Swiss-Prot record:
GO terms for biological process: viral RNA genome replication; viral translational frameshifting. PROSITE patterns: RDRP_SSRNA_POS. Residues 561-676 form the RdRp catalytic domain. The keyword Disulfide bond does not apply. It comes from the Viruses. The lineage of its organism: Viruses, Riboviria, Orthornavirae, Kitrinoviricota, Tolucaviricetes. This is Putative RNA-directed RNA polymerase. It comes from Barley yellow dwarf virus (isolate P-PAV). Its EC number is 2.7.7.48.
Amino acid sequence: MFFEILIGASAKAVKDFISHCYSRLKSIYYSFKRWLMEISGQFKAHDAFVNMCFGHMADIEDFEAELAEEFAEREDEVEEARSLLKLLVAQKSKTGVTEAWTDFFTKSRGGVYAPLSCEPTRQELEAKSEKLEKLLEEQHQFEVRAAKKYIKEKGRGFINCWNDLRSRLRLVKDVKDEAKDNARAAAKIGAEMFAPVDVQDLYSFTEVKKVETGLMKEVVKERNGEEEKHLEPIMEEVRSIKDTAEARDAASTWITETVKLKNSTLNADELSLATIARYVENVGDKFKLDIASKTYLKQVASMSVPIPTNKDIKLKMVLQSPEARARREPLDVLDSVGFLEGLCTASGFESPFPILGLPEIAVTDGARLRKVSSNIRYLSQTHLGLVYKAPNASLHNALVAVERRVFTVGKGDKAIYPPRPEHDIFTDTMDYFQKSIIEEVGYCRTYPAQLLANSYSAGKRAMYHKAIASLRTVPYHQKDANVQAFLKKEKHWMTKDIAPRLICPRSKRYNIILGTRLKFNEKKIMHAIDSVFGSPTVLSGYDNFKQGRIIAKKWQKFACPVAIGVDASRFDQHVSEQALKWEHGIYNGIFGDSELALALEHQITNNIKMFVEDKMLRFKVRGHRMSGDINTSMGNKLIMCGMMHAYFKKLGVEAELCNNGDDCVIITDRANEKLFDGMYDHFLQYGFNMVTEKPVYELEQLEFCQSKPVSINGKYRMVRRPDSIGKDSTTLLSMLNQSDVKSYMSAVAQCGLVLNAGVPILESFYKCLYRSSGYKKVSEEFIKNVISYGTDERLQGRRTYNETPITNHSRMSYWESFGVDPKIQQIVERYYDGLTVSAQLQSVKVTTPHLQSILLSIPENHSQIEY
């Protein structure tokens, strides 16, 4: 046993070991103490070691403190009496008086006077001698009483030749005195730490002036009934620091504390100084400070922020003190640090929306009972505290999905139906766009059904081959277009009330009719949209590298660009019968195929059934996009781009469009921004609720498909938001063992590294996952099973990771996009670089991660979260 090695160690080594364990490793300290008690008295050679160890242990109990105080008081009285008697004897003998008087002076507690030169009488000497004997007797009685107290409280072995009573009581007194000194010092430091900081408000040391911009405006004034025109200079309000020493001092304090409030880890390295300068620039722009004030604040902040104050140093000392570390140890246990790391499980959710009880939905009993797991699994160390869940496959969720996603658009307990388009508005305003697409596409061939079947994975492939054989014997008929819906099992970020979504596929026989015509010609039709707009418009066919460059090029077309995000609320639900017929007109114009035309006509009226639990739901709807149709994605892009092109034409503006179905971003000149104020009313005429986002005036703030442009080594690339870390740390796949978890981590990491080479934070996260998986090799089929459709679109077949250095330029661009400054980026990257993600399967459902979302500036309610 390790403790036995200490028996032969030196006294200093044993003392150091005990001190270290007592301050840092309490569990080992208590184990060591228990071991000492076990070996005590068993072997005489060990007793000396035990006594020495107990002599070094300072775990003081309450009764000892009282005894130590009384012992110290009595010992001082004895020493004072002894030194006084010694002085009197010296004065009587007239030898060594000075030394005796000095000794008495140092030991006297005050109140006893003894002149330096006098000759005491015999009676005085006897009286002082008797007093000393009395004090010694009282002290002896006290020690007997104290020894009995120790035997009662600690047992007979505690006080011994190595740990005698007087040494123990002196040790207790010293420890208690030290504790009092520490308490006084702590109170002093506490008073300094919690003293209010005198920081004046910005408005108190600045003033606002109006200055000429150099531009002129025409002003019309009426004089004597006649209008007179003349030019006046355009004035602009500018804030500046007042020209006084007090104002400059206040400004210095203000900017220092403001920057430290943003980031308290900044120092004097190149990246920190660049970060400080950017913070000052942002503050200056926010408060419209003049250039002189910005320059002054930058100079001050560059000098004052990197240099720690005494308060900063003391704060760090307090946080890293042994006592502070000891207090954090129990919290590490309570927060499950260490032993709850791994893959945890969260159960599904029930939608909070009430059932409306629509008569259009028929619910019948007698169906086969279906049980579908809705558990979601997540890596406890990297999920950022973001809660993702999947909807339960329950009757309640099914009814909510049908009522809220198919029939109604309201969020309350009343049935509010989607708006209807104006009569013939698609034909009247978008007929030219339809004809342009047909003309651009030209001839499209019909592909063999076998090719369609072979484009799917093994399970679906067999079903399609069976459908092909069926079509050879039984021709296509209308029943093949019937829909069997099911709840979509997907990750939902639980930040607001959610209505689950439906997947509404038709039969494989139906899909063969559409797929052989539309699936393999989709890119050709999408490029036709680009041709009509005059630039790449549908960006879903490009990887995130190419998307970033396209969007940057669109942005650079305008002198003063602005980006307006547009999102069609629940697009599929708002696709009307009129919109479908307009879309189908494009396909029919391209192919001229009667079988395709018949199949498309069957999309107008949809007979839908849905099985959930032991119930069957039946409902019928005219119009509406069925999300399982092969033409869902392409059709939505055609409709949205057609409406946008007609809108641009109506406004007569030059604008660029970035489209990915129902998600759009309009880029135009800032002078045209006001023209788009009527967008909601315009699209309402087409039957769509179009939600516009707040315009942005910086390229890095443009958000498209939950990504933003970031300049990586001088080239713009679309980079996913930081909350993607939490999303990629969750999976809907079943994980049976650690090998499954490592395969999942490897698949996510390999794709993530391809997309995020050279990207701050994200590259380190995916490297961490890949390293933790043991660099496990996984098949292409498994990768496609793990990654989402959106990630697959961003990759566009890329599988090669090209290592790219993270430059300061990239860090500054990432900061502009996501609000995480370069120093925080480095801190997060160091965390991931030193982290090994556990693949252990855990039974617990809720844990708190080390790295939480607030450090990455992830808002609790993101504007892009769908209802």
